[in-house]
C-alpha cells in the first residue's frame, strides 16, 4: 500500500514577510491521516484555518492568497505549497504569526530543507492521487494551460519574455517529475521582478520585504543580483515551481501531463478548477502495490532520508 505522508516532528523557522517586511515565525506540525494541508494564522484570536483548496485561491499582483468566507486571507502560500507537492506531503498544519508565509529566499528550497529536517513519516492510510482521464484546457488571450492523461506527472512550460537577460533558448523547460528531480532542478529557482516595479510598490507601502535576498531583480537590460542566476533558465524553472504549487491546491499529487504557455497563478488555478468541475476528467485512485505506482511518486532514499 502506498501510504499518506506527514512530518515526524514539529519544525520552526523565521523569515520576512514579502508584504509587510516584518519578521514572521513559521511552525509546521505533523497531522493525522486525511487532515490535508491546513494553513493557520495564529496572529488572530481565535486562530483561523485555511485548508488548501482550489476555490479559496485568490491571485494578487505579488502572490497567491487563500481567502475564507469572511474575506480573511493568508498570503504568499505558493512556494511552500510547491515544496509540499514536491515531497508528497499529504497532511500538515502550517502556522504563521502573521498574515503571510515568509518569503525566505524567493524559492521553495528553504521549505524543502525544513521539511526534510523534520523528517517524513508514513501513515497507515492509503495515499490518494488525482488521475487525469480527459484533456482539459483553458485559455486567456494568447496564454493557455492544459492537463492531459499520462501515467506519471510531467510538466512542459514556456514563457515569452522579451528581455535581454532572458535568452530565447531558456524560455522553455520540461520535467518528468519525481521528488528528487523537484529538489535538484526546480526547488532552488527564485521568483523574479523588475527593480522599477519593486521601487514603485515600496513607495506605496507595498512589497516592503522585497529585496535582492528574496528574488531575482532585473532592470531593462540585465540581472542586478551580485551572484547572478542559479540556473541559466531560472526564470522558466520558477514559473514551473509556481505551477507545481498551484496544482497541489487540489490536495492530491496529480497523475497527468501539464503543458502551459505564458501561464501564471491565476490561469493555473483556472485550469485546476476546470478539471475539478468536469467530473469525467478525473478520478481519485490509490495503489495497494508499489509496483503499480508511476515512477514519479516513488520517494528516493536521497530525499526521504
From Swiss-Prot:
GO cellular component annotations of the record: membrane
Catalytic function, reaction form: a UDP-3-O-[(3R)-3-hydroxyacyl]-N-acetyl-alpha-D-glucosamine + H2O = a UDP-3-O-[(3R)-3-hydroxyacyl]-alpha-D-glucosamine + acetate
Enzymatic class: hydrolase
Coiled coil feature spans: none
Pfam families xrefs: LpxC (PF03331)
Superkingdom of the organism of origin: Bacteria
Keyword hit for Ligase: no
GO MF annotation: an example: metal ion binding
Residues reported to bind Zn(2+): 79, 238, 242
Function: Catalyzes the hydrolysis of UDP-3-O-myristoyl-N-acetylglucosamine to form UDP-3-O-myristoylglucosamine and acetate, the committed step in lipid A biosynthesis.
Entry similarity comment: Belongs to the LpxC family.
Name under which the protein is recorded: UDP-3-O-acyl-N-acetylglucosamine deacetylase
Organism in which the protein naturally occurs: Photorhabdus laumondii subsp. laumondii (strain DSM 15139 / CIP 105565 / TT01)
Lineage: Bacteria, Pseudomonadati, Pseudomonadota, Gammaproteobacteria, Enterobacterales
Gene: lpxC
Amino acid at each position: 500500500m502506498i501510504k499518506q505522508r506527514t512530518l515526524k516532528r514539529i519544525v520552526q523557522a523565521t523569515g520576512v514577510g514579502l508584504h509587510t517586511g516584518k519578521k514572521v515565525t513559521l511552525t509546521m506540525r505533523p497531522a493525522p491521516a486525511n487532515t490535508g494541508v491546513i494553513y493557520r494564522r495564529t496572529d488572530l484570536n481565535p486562530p483561523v484555518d485555511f485548508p488548501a483548496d482550489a476555490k479559496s485561491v485568490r491571485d494578487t499582483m505579488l502572490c497567491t492568497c487563500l481567502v475564507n468566507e469572511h474575506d480573511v486571507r493568508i498570503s504568499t502560500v505558493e512556494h511552500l505549497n510547491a515544496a509540499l507537492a514536491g515531497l508528497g506531503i499529504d497532511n500538515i498544519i502550517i502556522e504563521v504569526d502573521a498574515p503571510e508565509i515568509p518569503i525566505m529566499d524567493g524559492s521553495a528550497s528553504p521549505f524543502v530543507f525544513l521539511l526534510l529536517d523534520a523528517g517524513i513519516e508514513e501513515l497507515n492510510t492509503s495515499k490518494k492521487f488525482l488521475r487525469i482521464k480527459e484533456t482539459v484546457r483553458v485559455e486567456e488571450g494568447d496564454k493557455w494551460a492544459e492537463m492531459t492523461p499520462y501515467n506519471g506527472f510531467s510538466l512542459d512550460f514556456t514563457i515569452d519574455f522579451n528581455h535581454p537577460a532572458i535568452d530565447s533558448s531558456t524560455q522553455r523547460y520540461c520535467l518528468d517529475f519525481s521528488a528528487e528531480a523537484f529538489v535538484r532542478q526546480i526547488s532552488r529557482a527564485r521568483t523574479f521582478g523588475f527593480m522599477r516595479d519593486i521601487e514603485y510598490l515600496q513607495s506605496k507601502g507595498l512589497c516592503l520585504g522585497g529585496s535582492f535576498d528574496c528574488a531575482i531583480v532585473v532592470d531593462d537590460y540585465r540581472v542586478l543580483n551580485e551572484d547572478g542566476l542559479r540556473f541559466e533558465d531560472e526564470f522558466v524553472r520558477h514559473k514551473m515551481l509556481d505551477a507545481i504549487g498551484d496544482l497541489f491546491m487540489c490536495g492530491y499529487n496529480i497523475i497527468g501531463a501539464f503543458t502551459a504557455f505564458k501561464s501564471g497563478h491565476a490561469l493555473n488555478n483556472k485550469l485546476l478548477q476546470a478539471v475539478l468541475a468536469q467530473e469525467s476528467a478525473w478520478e481519485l485512485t490509490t495503489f495497494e502495490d508499489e509496483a503499480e505506482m508511476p515512477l514519479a511518486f516513488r520517494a528516493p532514499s536521497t530525499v526521504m532520508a
